[in-house]
């Protein structure tokens, strides 16, 4: 992909030990078309295009944003050199992490094994394709010079792109918090990119949940007040507006957004701790171990913030004027029902993690690996439609499997607030719902829940991409 740039760089190296700065200096003067001592985005785009270099979408903007220390929209010679030197250090870390046998060369097997550790399985043929795209001398191995020159103007290397493009739970937020946490590479941990990605994901989740809050509240209302005559989505929305006005459609959304930060932080911390227990002697964490560690991390995070889940449900089903806010709701629950009320529905909630997370992970990994095996050619980027499609499909299947438990959890959280309602346990509620409404009653409210999936993942993806630019990811 970068053959002409590689030839340009290599042909101007006086010898193998040639100083990097002299090569970068000559490259700068070639890109500086108008000879004003600065390189802007347009010059970078045209210069790289003229050299036959195909970079990812928005790569030029990211390069200028990352290197432009004085924020004048250009890269002067000093900024240009500093950016490439810093980028070269990052590329060296990535190269070293892939070169498992420390022979100074990367082979197809090392590419396969490195991706396998992260749950990405590719064939030997696909690994060969990745390697050949970097192999300029036809040796079927990639040394440091080939690696450096291939990724000189890519904000990320190809292996990192495969991992980053296919991150799932960090990028897509559909309102449920039962997904397995994403893996962060050693480079992302060392450079601090991990917390920026979590922050971007948190902001994406907040905007996504707020945008789909009316459908989420309608789902809760249909779960709690389920009946065969109360299943029309439009009618349900009209009733909520009639009872409390337009603002009532967002009742309970504040708690739903606030809990993102502590839950994400706890899940990430717990996942890192559980991974240490399940990592093999070779340092590898397989898909099965990742599922167990991720499920335990999800259970730990849910346990820590579960009272907020109860508050969200109570606020959502509450009447207008019943609670003045989150703290008033918590105070009234404590006074009337005691502290145990904040963990009503906890058992079905924890049990729901296993089918949701397991099926979501299995289907997403299957779809991801199928695309990588059959459709990935020169780029690791699957495109927005493929990403959203895979995320939507896996999440939908996970929801179908765990929805009955989610419905029972919501009923248990809310039943004490309904006058005259008996306080049933999980088994009692299950039998009552099946006897009164049939097995379809266990899926009451799934209509608005499915309706919000596509807009939720779309909103979260767009916001996540915008936040990545703002945070310099």
Curated annotation (Swiss-Prot):
GO terms for biological process: adenine nucleotide transport; ADP transport; ATP transport; cellular response to calcium ion; mitochondrial ATP transmembrane transport. It is found in: Mitochondrion inner membrane. Keywords: Antiport, Calcium, Membrane, Metal-binding, Mitochondrion, Mitochondrion inner membrane, Repeat, Transmembrane, Transmembrane helix, Transport. One of its GO terms (molecular function) is ADP:phosphate antiporter activity. One of its GO terms (cellular component) is mitochondrion. It catalyses: Mg(2+)(out) + phosphate(in) + ATP(out) = Mg(2+)(in) + phosphate(out) + ATP(in); ADP(out) + phosphate(in) + H(+)(out) = ADP(in) + phosphate(out) + H(+)(in); AMP(out) + phosphate(in) = AMP(in) + phosphate(out); phosphate(in) + ATP(out) + 2 H(+)(out) = phosphate(out) + ATP(in) + 2 H(+)(in). The keyword Transmembrane applies. Ca(2+) 3 binds at residues 99, 101, 103, 105, 110. It holds the Pfam family Mito_carr. It comes from the Eukaryota. Its main location: mitochondrion. The chain crosses the membrane at residues 198-215, 252-271, 295-308, 345-364, 388-405, 445-464. Residues 1-197, 272-294, 365-387, 465-473 are mitochondrial intermembrane. Residues 174-473 are annotated as: C-terminal transmembrane transporter domain. The keyword Repeat applies. Residues 159-168 are annotated as: Linker region. Residues 216-251, 309-344, 406-444 are mitochondrial matrix. Residues 19-54, 55-88, 86-121, 122-157 form the EF-hand domain. It is a multi-pass membrane protein. Solcar repeats lie at residues 192-277, 285-370, 382-470. Residues 1-173 are annotated as: Regulatory N-terminal domain. Ca(2+) 2 binds at residues 68, 70, 72, 74, 79. The regulatory N-terminal domain/NTD formed of two pairs of fused calcium-binding EF-hands, binds calcium in the mitochondrial intermembrane space and regulates the antiporter activity of the transmembrane domain/TMD. In absence of calcium, the apo form of the N-terminal domain is intrinsically disordered and binds to the transmembrane domain, inhibiting the transporter activity. Binding of calcium leads to a major conformational change and abolishes the interaction with the transmembrane domain and the inhibition of the transporter activity. The C-terminal mitochondrial carrier domain/transmembrane domain/TMD bears the transmembrane transporter activity. PANTHER family: SOLUTE CARRIER FAMILY 25. Belongs to the mitochondrial carrier (TC 2.A.29) family. This is Mitochondrial adenyl nucleotide antiporter SLC25A24-B. It comes from Xenopus laevis (African clawed frog). The gene is slc25a24-b.
């Amino acid at each position: 992909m970068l053959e002409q740039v590689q030839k340009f760089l290599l042909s101007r190296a006086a010898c193998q030990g040639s100083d990097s700065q002299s090569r970068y200096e000559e490259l700068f003067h070639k890109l500086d078309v108008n000879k004003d001592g600065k390189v802007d985005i347009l010059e970078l785009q045209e210069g790289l295009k003229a050299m036959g270099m195909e970079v990812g979408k928005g790569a030029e903007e990211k390069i200028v944003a990352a290197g432009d220390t004085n924020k004048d929209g250009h890269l002067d010679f000093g900024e240009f050199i500093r950016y490439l030197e810093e980028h070269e250090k990052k590329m060296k870390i990535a190269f070293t992490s892939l070169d498992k046998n420390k022979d100074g060369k990367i082979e197809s097997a090392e590419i396969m094994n490195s991706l396998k550790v992260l749950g990405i399985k590719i064939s030997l043929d696909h690994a060969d394709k990745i390697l050949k795209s970097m192999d300029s001398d036809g040796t079927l191995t990639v040394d440091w010079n080939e690696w450096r020159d291939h990724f000189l103007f890519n904000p990320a290397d190809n292996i990192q792109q495969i991992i980053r493009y296919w991150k799932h739970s960090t990028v897509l937020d559909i309102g449920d918090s039962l997904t397995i946490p994403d893996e962060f590479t050693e480079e992302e941990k060392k450079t601090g990119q991990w917390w920026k990605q979590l922050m971007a994901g948190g902001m994406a989740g907040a905007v996504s949940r707020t945008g789909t809050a009316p459908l989420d509240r309608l789902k809760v209302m249909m779960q709690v007040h389920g009946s065969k005559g109360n299943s029309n989505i439009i009618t349900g929305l009209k009733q909520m507006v009639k009872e409390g006005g337009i603002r009532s459609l967002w009742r309970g959304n504040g708690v739903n957004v606030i809990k993102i930060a502590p839950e994400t932080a706890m899940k990430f911390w717990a996942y890192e701790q559980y991974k240490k227990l399940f990592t093999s002697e070779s340092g590898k964490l397989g898909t099965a171990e990742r599922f167990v560690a991720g499920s335990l991390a999800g259970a730990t995070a849910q346990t820590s913030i579960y009272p907020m889940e109860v508050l969200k449900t109570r606020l959502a089903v509450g009447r207008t004027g019943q609670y003045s806010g989150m703290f008033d709701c918590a105070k009234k629950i404590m006074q009337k029902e005691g502290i145990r009320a904040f963990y009503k529905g906890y058992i079905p909630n924890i049990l729901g993690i296993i089918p949701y997370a397991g099926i979501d992970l299995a289907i997403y990994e299957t779809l991801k690996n199928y695309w990588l095996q059959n459709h990935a050619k020169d780029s690791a980027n699957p495109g927005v439609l493929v990403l959203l499609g895979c995320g939507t499909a896996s999440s939908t299947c996970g929801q179908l499997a765990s929805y009955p438990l989610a419905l029972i959890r919501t009923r248990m959280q809310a039943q004490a607030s309904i006058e005259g309602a008996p306080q049933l346990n999980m088994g009692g509620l299950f039998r009552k719902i099946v006897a009164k409404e049939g097995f379809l009653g266990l899926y009451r409210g799934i209509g608005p829940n499915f309706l919000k999936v596509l807009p939720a993942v779309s909103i979260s993806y767009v916001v996540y991409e915008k936040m990545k630019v703002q945070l310099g990811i």
